[in-house]
């Protein structure tokens, strides 16, 4: 994997920094694992914007990823690594001994030809998936299940990982990249190692159009809007907003705590780092 800084042959190329991975498959994705991925421009069924800054972007299919990894006892060979437009991580196409193919998140260090497997008897090796009660304390994992059988939900983006720091009865304690430490059920599964493509954070799109290709629209500051559109809007000439920063709906921002789910507070051992 290489970091390539483009030559300034035009204003749009001047600031571009690319992450080039020669190991990625250059052909088409595996068709049976593709699904339609329709665009909605951030609108709901009433046509109203429910998520801002979404619209346009290149068409692409959704790759069906196996986050559950429940095909136990059957070894699988990594056929190839692929780019996935739906996530920051790369994905791996694996071929099981019984002939079935699935996509999984590509772990760091796993290359084409490697053999992976799932189940309680799987060895502690990058890419293998086990219940967390069978993973040694201190191990680095990713694709961590919050609810056993639901599929991995934590540590799935490029370069992400969690560390198992303790085991206590039916729960294990994991430390996330944010610094948060929380308990999860030890019956839940996790994959050994960290997610690959950690250099993703080093890329620079270089121009606004590159964000538009990805379906991301511009973010407009509230102070340049009209009062009808934002609490910071209006005023004669340039203003500072005239109040503490708030969202377009009047909710205080920049440090104001918005977490409402008190039901799961008991599972959080330590809050994330600020």
Curated annotation (Swiss-Prot):
PROSITE patterns: RIBOSOMAL_L2 (PS00467). Residues 223-265 are annotated as: Disordered. Keywords: Ribonucleoprotein, Ribosomal protein, RNA-binding, rRNA-binding. GO terms for cellular component: large ribosomal subunit. It holds the Pfam family Ribosomal_L2_C. The keyword tRNA processing does not apply. Gene3D superfamilies: 2.30.30.30, Nucleic acid-binding proteins, Ribosomal protein L2, domain 3. Coiled coil: none annotated. The keyword Ribosomal protein applies. Residues 256-265 have a biased composition (Basic residues). GO terms for biological process: cytoplasmic translation. One of its GO terms (molecular function) is transferase activity. Belongs to the universal ribosomal protein uL2 family. One of the primary rRNA binding proteins. Required for association of the 30S and 50S subunits to form the 70S ribosome, for tRNA binding and peptide bond formation. It has been suggested to have peptidyltransferase activity; this is somewhat controversial. Makes several contacts with the 16S rRNA in the 70S ribosome. Part of the 50S ribosomal subunit. Forms a bridge to the 30S subunit in the 70S ribosome. NCBIfam families: rplB_bact. This is Large ribosomal subunit protein uL2. It comes from Vibrio parahaemolyticus serotype O3:K6 (strain RIMD 2210633).
């Amino acid at each position: 994997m290489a970091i390539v800084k483009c030559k300034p042959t035009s204003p749009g190329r001047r600031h571009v920094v690319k992450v080039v991975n020669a190991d990625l498959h250059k052909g088409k994705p595996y068709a049976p694992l593709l699904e339609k991925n329709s665009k909605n421009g951030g609108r709901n069924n009433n046509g109203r914007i429910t998520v801002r800054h979404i619209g346009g972007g290149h068409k692409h299919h959704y790759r069906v990823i196996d986050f559950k990894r429940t095909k136990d006892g059957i070894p699988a060979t990594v056929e190839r690594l692929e780019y996935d437009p739906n996530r920051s991580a790369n994905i791996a196409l694996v071929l099981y001994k019984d002939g079935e193919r699935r996509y999984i998140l590509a772990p760091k260090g796993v290359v084409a030809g490697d053999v992976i497997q799932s189940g309680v008897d799987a060895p502690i090796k990058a890419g293998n998936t086990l219940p967390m009660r069978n993973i040694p304390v201190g191990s680095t994992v990713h694709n961590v299940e919050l609810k056993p059988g639901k599929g991995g939900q934590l540590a799935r983006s490029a370069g992400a990982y969690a560390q198992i720091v303790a085991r206590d009865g039916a729960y294990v304690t994991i430390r996330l990249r944010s610094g948060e430490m929380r308990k999860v059920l030890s019956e839940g599964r996790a994959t050994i190692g960290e997610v690959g493509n950690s250099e993703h954070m080093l890329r620079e799109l270089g121009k606004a159009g590159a964000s538009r290709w990805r379906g991301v629209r511009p973010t407009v500051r509230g102070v340049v809007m009209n009062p009808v559109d934002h609490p910071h809007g209006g005023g004669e000439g340039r203003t500072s907003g005239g109040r503490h920063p708030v969202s377009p709906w009047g909710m205080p921002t920049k440090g104001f705590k918005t977490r409402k789910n008190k039901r799961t507070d008991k599972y959080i051992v330590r809050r994330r780092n600020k």
